[in-house]
């Protein structure tokens, strides 16, 4: 207090010559008594200034977060269009993923994901099996147990309501456009590729792209995405803006009520060989009846989720795709739809989920000048699964799906695929 008072009095003086002998003696005594403390205080101030300068130069300290998932499944197929008898053999497979997430500024996210899997030869969908994409599982993949980079993504928030995404590896339209499906999760959702989400979001077998997500209000969201195949190659028909397979999508995503989510999407794509490449329907549908020439594809997709009561959710989606050949008058119209009903926490078991999914895989319903015509009949996909929660990190999902008239052909007997999927998350 004495030192503070003295310094204040000193600051009020314009000249040291104005100090009286008594004041000089007081200053000398304070200097002797507090000299050590003043020197220590000076060192501390220097240290604080150094730390402040470091914080100003590095405003955010990046933190790396690691997470992973391993899906182990025992699966088997029965009946169907089995050309060799191999489809009935049970298979024991895995899909393992390891991801890393970090932020460089606090308003962005850098994500890398590595994957290894061993589901060989397209599984039950192979020519030696059911010979149909309708038999594909949602967690199916094959890297021959080699670790591969499956996802590289960078997202940055330009404002509190506007985010842009760039994904040079592992892109699909659903990387930006919300699929609005409660079953779009390979480890915890639907067991089939068809039932997990609408084919519209899988159009083109893309591998690189980006987009934006704009939260216009608390109930309205606008999303846009653009992607291509072979974006890393500079040859003709490849690259980011000259690829022979590209797709653009825009979606208006709405929340009209606290328990309702709905989305309406418009799609515009180019295919150098006329294929849709969604791998969710018949060969005729996915190849546009083997159109085999450049085509412009336009589509409309609608989705809905409605939480009827606390534990019951109804969901649905419908897709219409219109393909027109560029060099001829060939055209094709394909459709697909699905209805889902799920019940959460059955038998008072928190975290469990039982779901029933019924829909039509992608089908050619009309066309002009198509080499192999339209799909004559209609397949129906019926799926039932029960996700059993063992802990926060482990779940077991027994499930089965049946496809009537596989490949939309009434001459083919129904195919059945069953699985017991165990998912570990860490």
Task: Identify the residue ranges that each predicted region occupies.
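N-terminal periplasmic/intermembrane-space "pro-region" immediately following the signal or transit peptide
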Residues: 1-85
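Repeated loop/turn-to-beta-strand initiation elements of outer-membrane beta-barrel proteins
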Residues: 106-110, 161-164, 218-224, 258-264, ...
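Outer membrane beta-barrel transmembrane domains
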Residues: 265-294, 301-305, 315-410
